[in-house]
Amino acid sequence: MNGQNIRIRLKAFDHRILDTSTREIVNTAKRTGAQVRGPIPLPTRIEKFTVNRSPHVDKKSREQFEMRTHKRLLDIVDPTPQTVDALMKLDLAAGVDVEIKL
């Protein structure tokens, strides 16, 4: 697989789970002899929701909730076939969305 790069994008709501999953991928790739660029932290997406506290009156009384989506980017340069096999067998934590581009 000479001349190819594997780009991995990870997304999660909890940054601790995201960082441990990223570390697992980096350690697996380095163990199999591939060069890793990253992890590169991408901007966190913050969605805010504003709702009324009471069901029908008191428009001035509101509550805000937010949902944060943390993202990381990894590039694996010139992966070996062993690297690809190891990454396919890797079991990551639940709650981590993985996108892989070749």
From Swiss-Prot:
<dbReference type="GO" id="GO:1990904">
    <property type="term" value="C:ribonucleoprotein complex"/>
</dbReference>
<dbReference type="InterPro" id="IPR036838">
    <property type="entry name" value="Ribosomal_uS10_dom_sf"/>
</dbReference>
<comment type="function">
    <text>Involved in the binding of tRNA to the ribosomes.</text>
</comment>
<keyword id="KW-0687">Ribonucleoprotein</keyword>
<dbReference type="InterPro" id="IPR027486">
    <property type="entry name" value="Ribosomal_uS10_dom"/>
</dbReference>
<keyword id="KW-0689">Ribosomal protein</keyword>
<dbReference type="GO" id="GO:0003735">
    <property type="term" value="F:structural constituent of ribosome"/>
</dbReference>
<comment type="similarity">
    <text>Belongs to the universal ribosomal protein uS10 family.</text>
</comment>
<dbReference type="InterPro" id="IPR001848">
    <property type="entry name" value="Ribosomal_uS10"/>
</dbReference>
<dbReference type="GO" id="GO:0000049">
    <property type="term" value="F:tRNA binding"/>
</dbReference>
<dbReference type="GO" id="GO:0005840">
    <property type="term" value="C:ribosome"/>
</dbReference>
<comment type="subunit">
    <text>Part of the 30S ribosomal subunit.</text>
</comment>
<dbReference type="GO" id="GO:0006412">
    <property type="term" value="P:translation"/>
</dbReference>
<dbReference type="Pfam" id="PF00338">
    <property type="entry name" value="Ribosomal_S10"/>
</dbReference>
<protein>
    <recommendedName>
        <fullName>Small ribosomal subunit protein uS10</fullName>
    </recommendedName>
</protein>
<dbReference type="InterPro" id="IPR018268">
    <property type="entry name" value="Ribosomal_uS10_CS"/>
</dbReference>
